[in-house]
């Protein structure tokens, strides 16, 4: 019983990871959303976000923020 439950959970996780990878591949976004990695040279943030110089990920653009 425990083994079959583990197989079901493992199968659901595998299905989720596969669908997430397929969705990421089809969107092919050239810019990063919230908390996406960026460096300001080769990877950029979408409009409404700025690349944090400290953490190197996209954060919400706020007035008065660099």
UniProtKB/Swiss-Prot annotation:
Organism of provenance: Chilobrachys guangxiensis
Signal peptide: 1-21
Disulfide bonds: 31-46, 38-51, 45-58
Propeptide: 22-29
Cell compartments where the protein resides: Secreted
Described function: Probable ion channel inhibitor.
InterPro entries: Huwentoxin-1, Huwentoxin_CS1
One GO CC term on file: extracellular region
Entry's family note: Belongs to the neurotoxin 10 (Hwtx-1) family. 46 (Jztx-7/10/12) subfamily.
Domain of life: Eukaryota
Tissue and organ distribution: Expressed by the venom gland.
Protein name, UniProt field: U1-theraphotoxin-Cg1a 1
One Pfam family recorded for the sequence: Toxin_12
Recorded coiled-coil stretches: none
Keyword tags: Amidation, Disulfide bond, Ion channel impairing toxin, Knottin, Neurotoxin, Secreted, Signal, Toxin
A single MF term (Gene Ontology): toxin activity
Record's keyword annotation contains Nuclease: no
Proline amide carried by residues: 63
Lineage summary: Eukaryota, Metazoa, Ecdysozoa, Arthropoda, Chelicerata
UniProt comment concerning the protein's domains: The presence of a 'disulfide through disulfide knot' structurally defines this protein as a knottin.
